[in-house]
C-alpha cells in the first residue's frame, strides 16, 4: 500500500481487494502489474478464493482455474508451501493461466489441462481444499457483458447444470476426509446453485454445508427452492449487484466428514538427484535450502517440484513445478519464473529500480 501509485478504496468484504476508477487510471499498463504486485479482477469474483480457508502447506486444487485470478490468490495463501494444482480443460486458456501464475511468482504448482474425470485418476482423496468456479449460464454478468445474454440463449441453466453436477461429484472424490470444497458460479438460477449442491449431498451425504464468513451485503441461499427445504442452504451465499458493488455470484462451502471412506492416491517416491555444478554455483548466491530430491531435469530444463505428489505418468501438464532455468554451455541461465519467485532478500545481487525509471 505504501508504494501504490493509484487512488484506491477498499472492497469491504475482501481483506486484500480494492476498487479503482478505470476511467482515470490504467493499472494494467503500470510496471507494478508486470512485476506481479496485483491482479485485476471483478470484485465479486474475488470472493470464492478469499472465502476458501487455505492454509500454508495445504494441497489445493482449482478445477476450472483459467485465467488465474482465483488461482493466484490461492497460491499466495499457500506461501510457497504445499501444492497448488491449477487446471483448465482448455489448453489455450491454461497457457494464459500459466503465464499469470508465473508472473505472480507462484512456484509450488502444477498447471494442467485435463477433464476433471481424468484428474480423479491421479488425485483420488488427495486434496485438503478444492475450489470449483464452475462454468455456468452467466446470469450474474448480464449487466456487465451483454454478450452473456446471447450465450445464455444458446446454452441455458439446463445445459450447465448437467456439467456442474459432473464436475462437483468428480471433485468430491478428490477431496480427502475432513477437507473443504468451495463451489461458486456467476449466475442466479437455483438449478445451477442450490440445485447442484442438493444433488451433491444426495450422492455424497458425507458432505455438510458450512458457514461462510459473512458481510452485510451478502444474501443467504434459498432453502425454499430445494426439494429438501433444508435450512442449511441459508448458509450458502448469493451476491446481488443491487445490494453490493460487484456482479452476481453464488458460493457454497462444503466439508467432507472426517469419517468418510474413500480411496487415496499414494505419494510417489522422489529420489535425490545430483545437483549440476552450474546450478550449484548459481545457487550459492540464493538463500534457499535447495533439496536435491525436488529437482527434475528434462534435457536442458531444470524444474523444482512440489513435494509429496502422486504418480502422474500420462497426465497433461503445461508446467510441473517451478522452472528454475536452463543448463546451457556449462552455465545455468535462470528463468523469468525463478526471478518472479525469488524475494529480493533471497538473492545476493539485486538492482532496485523505481517505477518511473527509463530502463523499465
PLM regions with names:
Residues 2-46:
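Conserved AdoMet
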Residues 57-66:
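Conserved class I S-adenosyl-L-methionine
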Residues 87-125:
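S-adenosyl-L-methionine
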Amino acid at each position: 500500500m505504501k508504494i501504490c501509485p493509484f487512488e484506491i478504496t477498499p472492497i469491504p468484504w475482501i481483506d486484500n481487494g480494492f476498487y479503482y476508477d478505470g476511467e482515470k487510471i490504467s493499472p494494467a499498463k503500470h510496471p507494478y502489474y508486470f512485476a506481479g504486485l496485483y491482479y485485476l479482477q471483478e470484485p465479486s469474483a474475488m470472493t470464492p478464493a478469499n472465502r476458501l480457508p487455505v492454509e500454508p502447506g495445504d494441497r489445493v486444487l482449482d478445477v476450472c482455474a483459467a485465467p488465474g485470478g482465483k488461482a493466484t490468490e490461492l497460491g499466495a495463501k499457500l506461501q510457497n508451501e504445499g501444492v497448488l494444482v491449477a487446471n483448465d480443460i482448455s489448453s489455450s486458456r491454461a497457457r494464459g493461466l500459466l503465464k499469470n501464475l508465473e508472473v505472480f511468482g507462484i512456484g509450488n504448482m502444477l498447471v494442467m489441462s485435463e477433464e476433471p474425470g481424468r484428474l480423479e485418476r491421479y488425485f483420488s482423496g488427495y486434496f485438503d481444499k478444492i475450489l470449483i468456479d464452475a462454468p455456468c449460464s452467466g446470469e450474474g454478468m448480464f449487466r456487465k457483458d451483454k454478450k452473456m445474454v446471447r450465450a445464455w440463449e444458446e446454452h441455458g441453466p439446463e445445459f450447465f447444470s448437467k456439467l456442474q453436477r459432473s464436475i462437483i461429484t468428480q471433485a468430491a472424490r478428490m477431496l480427502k476426509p475432513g477437507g473443504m470444497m468451495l463451489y461458486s458460479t456467476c449466475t442466479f438460477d437455483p438449478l445451477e446453485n442450490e440445485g447442484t449442491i442438493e444433488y451433491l449431498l444426495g450422492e455424497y451425504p458425507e458432505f455438510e454445508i458450512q458457514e461462510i464468513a459473512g458481510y452485510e451485503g451478502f444474501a443467504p441461499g434459498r432453502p425454499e427452492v430445494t426439494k429438501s427445504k433444508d435450512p442449511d442452504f441459508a448458509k450458502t451465499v448469493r451476491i446481488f449487484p443491487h445490494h453490493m458493488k460487484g456482479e452476481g455470484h453464488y458460493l457454497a462451502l462444503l466439508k467432507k466428514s472426517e469419517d468418510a471412506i474413500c480411496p487415496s492416491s499414494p505419494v510417489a517416491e522422489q529420489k535425490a538427484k545430483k545437483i549440476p555444478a552450474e546450478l550449484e554455483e548459481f545457487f550459492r548466491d540464493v538463500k534457499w535450502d535447495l533439496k536435491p530430491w525436488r529437482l527434475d531435469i528434462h534435457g536442458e530444463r531444470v524444474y523444482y517440484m512440489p513435494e509429496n505428489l502422486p504418480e502422474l505418468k500420462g497426465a497433461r501438464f503445461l508446467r510441473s513445478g517451478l522452472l528454475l532455468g536452463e543448463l546451457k554451455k556449462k552455465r545455468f541461465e535462470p528463468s523469468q519464473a525463478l526471478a518472479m519467485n525469488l524475494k529480493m532478500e533471497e538473492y545476493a545481487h539485486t538492482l532496485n529500480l523505481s517505477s518511473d525509471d527509463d530502463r523499465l
